């Protein structure tokens, strides 16, 4: 059994590791049922994450906006410091974190049958540009290579509906 931790102390000790583009670090690497991570801002993401299970967001410092696609329609959900938000399963989402923001995110460890995905939508017309699905085993290491593949591919970033080309996100500092 793991002992309790001083969460605020943990954040202070690990703040330097919360870097773009995703900026997350797992609190408990030994956990079997949950992925418990802290995510820092700013971030520079244009992707939407697809998860077959719910995700719990608790905003510790600063505010964020969780962009979602609900029934094919984009929507913004503000989550302010001190607020908690339970995102339903299978809702594409893109947390937008401002400078200095810190949030706790709790997700279920994926079963063998679970599939995660990253997807991008055209900034101009909302058409889906690209998606890639995978079995998630390590959230810290698996997302950046998918983002890199998309960002480095002009073909993937070009909308086949309106011809607009998505500009890769600018790295946040």
Language-model region placement:
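A short, N-terminal "cap"/entry segment at the start of jelly-roll beta-barrel domains
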Residues: 1-40, 45-47, 142-173
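His/acidic/aromatic-lined binding-pocket segments of jelly-roll/cupin-type domains
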Residues: 36, 47-49, 54-59, 76-77, ...
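Conserved metal-binding segment of the jelly-roll/cupin
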Residues: 39, 78-99, 107-108
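A short hydrophobic beta-strand segment most commonly corresponding to one strand
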Residues: 99-117
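Cys/His-rich microdomains that often coordinate metals
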Residues: 110, 126-131, 165-166
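Short cysteine-rich clusters marking metal-coordination/redox-active sites
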Residues: 120-125, 159-162
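Short recognition patches in nucleic-acid-associated and regulatory proteins
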Residues: 126-150
